[in-house]
């Protein structure tokens, strides 16, 4: 069975890992980095992903960041003169990860396990699967990020019984999961979180502070200047990282904008104390999900054996202190917060292929599922933190006499009223025989698969007629849209490959022209004019082809030049070899004469 890669598709950074033997290994990107920025840029028709895209974010307005925050919505992003769905942009990131994983493995990769925040709803999970499909990946499993982290942490501890709390603060989302590990079983007891809290929010607090201070001093609002804002974002992210290691950092942005008197510069120092003050409310928001998860799991703090930190934002000192204060435990530092999720995803890939044995992963659904019943009430069929996959049925009836049909309004959430929860979909069961209200028996069944994807069935127990849907949120993509996007992605891949081929050919032509001109100059007056003239003629023809830009002509003329240049090189080599031989012959004769003289002298010394 081919390898299944593990992908952590993050808000700010992504990572890819693969199982090698029993070890999960992070695959470095072409720039040698173990994580890749989740950034996509468009330039001159080319799609640029990762570090290169992030570097040009300041100057290139066609740059997309933090697309994960839009997954599962109908919101599109404009770039490159087009509109893209979040799934399409995410697919470009996935294609890039897939590409360098294939380069590392030396084989095609067609399957992946992709992680999502534990608190992702059905629409967001479906969007992630769709992105994988567009990227040419069969998504074998969608795994919750904290669960994947626990899997990576606990792989070498399958003989121990432990209860662990995973605190996962990423770039755009926050999750807390509590798991029980024992005899190779990873059982998720509870999960809680906040889909709108992450490292980006900490960056934003610094940006807001810098904008306010600059406006106070100069009367100019930098938030209205797109290029200045991007520079502020980069500076804020760097300052946040610096303050994890030092207590004060300098923010210096020369020529940030211009005033009536000329250019203006931003020079400010930011202390850790000030940063903590700016972000106090964000740190405070991490506490409620921790308490909620413990309550749902029915555990006290004293029953937690280990606390695992996941996500780059858990390096913020105030966050670490808050975790210590809330759990009463020193966090375990044995895992890399940036890499552990992708490593866990690769282990789950190994479980699927059978390369990892004696490991069972029991995940849960993060939010309750149910339907709207009379009076706009949300009636739950599956409670949050139910182990998946699962199935649950409940019998309902009609609300009016002779009601011919029932509308099934499928919802996800925790609020008591339907209007306050997330609509997953609607469908109708029709042709119900006329009967007084409360008589027809309508059985509604919810199924959640291993990926957390929901399907719902309604059945009239009297007529046995049923309706069945796999939930596709209004923001989801149709099969036709996914197919079109897959074709677009394939077409782009071909175009990118062709563009690279063109660049490689042009570079080869430049190199050949340079090398041949050098050789012709070096061989001037050395006697092989026929070969030199032939090489010069081929060189002139290649230069003309280069000028015209005709790729086929360039290819043909390059081959011709290589042939003539080779003939000239052979003559040069032959001449050099002959000269070397002649020189060695002269040295040999001289050595013989010298040896004869030495014999005479030695004879004199040996005479007694």
Swiss-Prot record:
Residues 578-608 are annotated as: Disordered. Residues 578-598 have a biased composition (Low complexity). Induction: By stress conditions e.g. heat shock. The keyword Transcription does not apply. The modification Phosphothreonine is found at residue 173. The keyword Ligase does not apply. Residues 599-608 have a biased composition (Acidic residues). Acts as a chaperone. PANTHER family: HEAT SHOCK PROTEIN 70KDA. This is Chaperone protein DnaK. The lineage of its organism: Bacteria, Bacillati, Bacillota, Bacilli, Lactobacillales. The gene is dnaK.
